[in-house]
């Protein structure tokens, strides 16, 4: 049994898979990504220049762990606290258009496919790509010497 996505750190995996998506050059980044907010609860657009690839990698990881998932579930996952000044804060969903466009572009790369029961799921090729990236970043453990008692 090899290394899977569940065996590595989520942060390291997301960064590595985002770099893989960016390096492949097959995923087109829309021009509106420089100035769009990721939700109505945000004040500014993301500071990270590669946030689009990072969000795509994060979506792939979520689909690996819990599949199938639709646009609404990603709105909830990436949602946050809306600050309303002196009024109490409330939860607010994230932008669904970003999740939808990302899933459509991942479908074009044959990483994600539509599930017949609703939502999206990883393809076998997508699962294989994710496991391969996870195996590359997994720490190489040296075999430990047997303990003598």
UniProtKB/Swiss-Prot annotation:
InterPro entries: Ribosomal_eS19, Ribosomal_eS19_CS, WH-like_DNA-bd_sf, WH_DNA-bd_sf
Pfam families noted in UniProt: Ribosomal_S19e (PF01090)
GO biological process annotation, one example: translation
Molecular functions per Gene Ontology: RNA binding; structural constituent of ribosome
SMART domains, per the entry: Ribosomal_S19e (SM01413)
Keywords: Ribonucleoprotein, Ribosomal protein
Coiled-coil regions listed in the entry: none
Gene Ontology CC, one term: cytosolic small ribosomal subunit
Family: Belongs to the eukaryotic ribosomal protein eS19 family.
Protein name: Small ribosomal subunit protein eS19
Native species: Mya arenaria (Soft-shell clam)
Lineage, highest ranks first: Eukaryota, Metazoa, Spiralia, Lophotrochozoa, Mollusca
Name of the gene: RPS19
